[in-house]
Amino acid sequence: MKRLMLLGTAVAVGLALSAAPTLAQRKITLNVITAGDQNMVDYVKDYLAPQFEKDHPDVTVKAVGTGPGDAGSQKIYEKLVAEKSNAEWDIDVAVIHQKAAGLMVNEQLLAAYVKDVSTGKFVSSAAASNSLGTDVKGYVIPMFNSQTAIAYNSDMVKQVPGTYDDLVKWVDANPNKFGYNGIKGGMSGVSFVVGWIYAYAPDADKLMKGPYDAGVKNSWDPAFAKLKDFNKKVVLTPGNAGTLDMLGRGEIAMGPVWVDMFYTWQADGKLPPSVKLKLIGPGMPGQPMYYVVPAKAANAKVAEQFIELATSPKVQAEGIVKKFNWYPGIDATAVKAQLDEATWNKLFVDVTPQDLSTKGKSFPIAPYFNDIQEGYEKKVQ
């Protein structure tokens, strides 16, 4: 309501004064809401916002985080649903996970903005068209792509597991030295659980590609039973950052992490050089996060300009790859041209392009994804 009153006042002043400022000179607060860990908020607030505000002195970027994992994106979804009947919505730009993107597109909560931004031509990934089985083409641009892997302290782990089977044997011999966050507090634990189901349940390919068959989940009981037994010998950490923190302090020797967070923590001195990465077979999921514009964003055009900056090859190179250690969200060839070879190659020290090609998986289509998370809560926790 406050936004509408402010807009009304601005219009009234414009009518009253023949030499009034243009709409472009009106002071605007661009509300950018992001799910994910604190590094997501830091990226918007400390990196993107100053650049955008420098080129748009009439705009103040306000960055707010809603928390890690799908729960963070769910809060954004609930906010949009609550405002659905309003003429304008408070959120101008949102950064969300795949699961929420499909839901929001299906419920007509997002604008099909990609055709209207100049950087739309750099959108090339399959995940920009299909999000866990839902057609999202035209509604999303990936902010980045990321991957989970197993981080391990090479001073403590001499025989590094190469597969889930190897990991189970290692944990049997080294109880309470592996840690993960279950399915709470972040997606690194969720990814580990999904990778477990891919390893020990039949037909992982069907889970990723569909079609959905509600009866398939009944075939996962042995995999969940095996995971429940596994969990008796591991440490449950507080979340994505919690796993990294325990690795850094030597409280655990191994655990699943996001590759980007791992490299950032290591660059900041919070992880010793002895901690390294291994993408184990048969594979673990990664995912993008998406820039979206809500269907009734109050500042939709400014939101599009903000996303154009954020998805430009220069910003993707300097911010996404060099500063925050993500894989680029737009076409990698456009980004690589902006970087020196050493910076580009740093992304692939432990997890190679070949690893990503053979063991980097997608998350399941949404209904199977829901079934896995519900199955974990009922049969593992």
Regions inferred by a protein language model and the residue ranges of each:
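Sec/Tat signal peptide C-region and signal peptidase I cleavage site
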Residues: 18-24
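A ligand-binding cleft/hinge motif common to bilobed small-molecule-binding domains
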Residues: 101-103, 256-273
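Mature extracytoplasmic/periplasmic domains
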Residues: 284-285, 289, 293-356
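Periplasmic-binding protein-like
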Residues: 146, 221-228, 271-292
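Extracytoplasmic ligand-binding site segments that recognize negatively charged/polar headgroups
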Residues: 35-45, 66, 70-71, 90, ...
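Conserved C-terminal helix/tail region of periplasmic/extracytoplasmic solute-binding proteins
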Residues: 350-381
